[in-house]
């Protein structure tokens, strides 16, 4: 999928197992850029070692419940989104909801339309697969991300714990409903 409305042509494609190293690199770099200034180096190092190693990303790519989309410009990976079919927290009213686990753009391109393109593709994919509700967790101190999600129609429905290294943090749980696609049944298609 090629997207207009960003500064350079942007391609969003589903990641494959061959993308594990590329996925690992963009996942860790965007996470560190986003949360490094507000967390200790020790907690950041511990979390990254637990979450972003190439073998971990390869395992996630291999799981049918995960879908990872990479955003690319001129051959460079500049962002990504990860969706996951997982049990939603109790505050999410739809038990068949799909989660946007992560959605990030490279720091030097934040505000250039990459996040917007990834969000649109994520919502489209969720709807195509029969999901009526999308939910996500966002750190309660990440005001920029919360504002972004609110612009996309997400509402705050509760909280959940997030362990970042040794630090116990609180994520806001946000959700939104999706329009039903014509001719779509009431059941969800599992990726």
Q: Whereabouts are the PLM-identified features?
A:
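Acetyl-CoA-dependent GNAT
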Residues: 14-20, 24-37, 42-108, 116-121, ...
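C-terminal "cap" of GNAT-fold acetyltransferases
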Residues: 94-98, 132-146, 150-191
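Extreme N-terminal starter segment of soluble prokaryotic enzymes
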Residues: 9-11
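Short acidic N-proximal helix/loop "leader" segments that mark the beginning
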Residues: 1-6
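Active-site acidic-Proline motif in GNAT/NAT acetyltransferases
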Residues: 106-108, 112, 140-141
